[in-house]
Amino acid sequence: MPTIEERDLRHIWHPCAQMKDYEQLPPMVIDHAKGAWLYDVHGKGYLDIVSSWWANLLGHTNEKINARIAAQLDRLEHVIFANFSHRPAIELAERLATLVPEGLTKFHFNDNGSSAVEAALKMAFQYCQQTGRTGKTRFMCLSEGYHGETIGALSVGSMDLFAEMYKPMMMDNIHIEAPDCYRCPYGETRDTCTCACFEHAEHAFAAHGHETAAMIVEPLLQGSAGMRIYPEEYLRKLRALCDAHDVLLIADEIATGFGRTGRLFACERAGITPDLMCLSKGLTGGYMPMSITVVKEKIYDAFYADWSEGKAFMHSHTYAGNPLGCSAALAVLDILDEENILERAEETASWLSARMEESFGAHPNVGEIRHIGLIHAVELVEDRAAKRPFDGGRRLGYAIYRCALRHGLLLRPLGDVLYFNPPLNIGRDDLDTAIARMKQSMDEVLGI
């Protein structure tokens, strides 16, 4: 009789992984979960300090979210969303309208983060075509940016790990050198930063603004690049530059939204309103695949016309606006409000920052500890003074990942950047456990 792991390997091709590596881990088959913990079929627990790809916002099997989904399941599980609607979607849009940055008024429902980005790109392009800006056909993005795995989303990303193979298929866009506050080429520090690097954006807009429909950006935090955090002032300057060149600004809040950066949305920290905003991951508490592209009224108005004019936005997904996902999202908003989650998370973040500094601040291979909200990242380097990274071929982060799994901690390093991105309501005992197990794993792999 084959084991459950052997049955998995026989048929399943897992995402974002080299299956030969996966075979050697060995595979972990999760049976159940509670709070920040996952438990495999053998009863072993794993502390999910990365919120299962940054999606689990309020803990696994949260009782309030469970109850809301269960109640909806007995009424309506799904319905076509083209020319039909339902209460959960209407209520969710109404609630979000009071929470998103001022000026964002219309909500287009999609299936997942990549599809929200695809919708935003198509909306921006079509908006320009339908408002007399027909020469604006390209997009701008930041180097090291990540916006999803579909072809359009890859085209506005800049990470070769995901995109190199598919470049012949991709759109030709303008990639702007992103801020790198740890290894600032201008010799500035986070405390002295004047955003000198913004000159790259200014040059790009001067050369290409006339042909650019939209600029897409992960506000304040480039997640997949290694939890790279950049200044709020950079985002404010980018908003002004887009306005000056009649370029739409798309904020990809898929990873940063719903409290991850200490505010409900990262754009709030900079006090800006994008023209389009993409939401997913924490939107449903990590329960259901759902996303929303939120836009300003002027975007919506450019599509509103008689059918004969051919201006409708014909982008659709089968499970757009799914009632179960909308119900989960409504429960998330209730919990955030009723349990003062953001305020409590801010207190936890301050405590965690001190604990991370205490535990890793003097480590000879820790180049920088950076954080925004509850997200904390530790960048490992071979030479701390020179900020020289380890040879990528060593796969140090992956080795620590494997070691941590043996100790019951789920990390998912970004290269040699180890990070915490836990549920917002995680307890301090769990965070202490995560710190201890991460340090143990680092020291074992580094031979300290």
PLM regions with names:
Residues M1-I448:
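Conserved N-terminal phosphate-binding loop of PLP-dependent enzymes in the Aspartate aminotransferase
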